[in-house]
């Protein structure tokens, strides 16, 4: 999911895997202004199409990850015209095994796609033209998504907490990880057993302009937690 301020207002770009499409809708009214179903122009069979992530380039080009099916990344222009696809399912260096999350990494000029290869516990960089650049980090649990703010990247992990990476792509800290491994990737934890500040399986996150972090926990009852940023001095 991505939130963007555009000339016509504020819009949310989001993948809907159950509906087999990506959408763009007005953040205030909820009106859908663009739908991106499977692009038949790609020449692929499209028997399965279950997109999981969506992000937008500075020029408005749209990227849609088919993370629950082919693991292709589809590229469209800002009007929804199909342009190309890249990436594929597999276990080689340049392949994905559940391209579950994706965002624009603005630490670089030009920006890069930062893609979560969930089942292989790593993040990858691709260019906006679909060319493989590098592995960013390996050895994570099950990274589900990524969000960039300033020098930091938040990476929710389905096995527990939220990994925070610095500008050098190294781990700064892990937030809310449960010491009990039985509570990682645990969907059915009842609400009366929730622990404040501890996650059971983070699935999404987003920063606000003050650097506070909103984290969505993968839970049968639904759970969103706000983590308030503190200064380095206040943390001492």
List where the protein language model places each region.
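Residue position within the beta-strands of beta-propeller blades
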Residues: 14, 64-65, 115, 155, ...
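Surface-exposed loop and turn segments in beta-propeller and other repeat-based domains
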Residues: 33-49, 81-97, 173-197
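Short loop/turn segments immediately following the C-termini of beta-strands
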Residues: 17, 67-69, 107, 118, ...
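Structural signal for beta-propeller blades
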Residues: 20-23, 71-73, 121-123, 161-163, ...
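Beta-rich, blade/repeat-based domains predominating
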Residues: 1-10, 41-61, 91-112, 120-121, ...
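A generic tandem-repeat structural signature
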Residues: 2-38
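Blade-level signature of beta-propeller repeat domains, shared across WD40, Kelch, NHL, RCC1
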Residues: 198-236
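Short loop/turn segments that connect beta-strands within beta-propeller blades
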Residues: 26-29, 77-81, 127-131, 166-170, ...
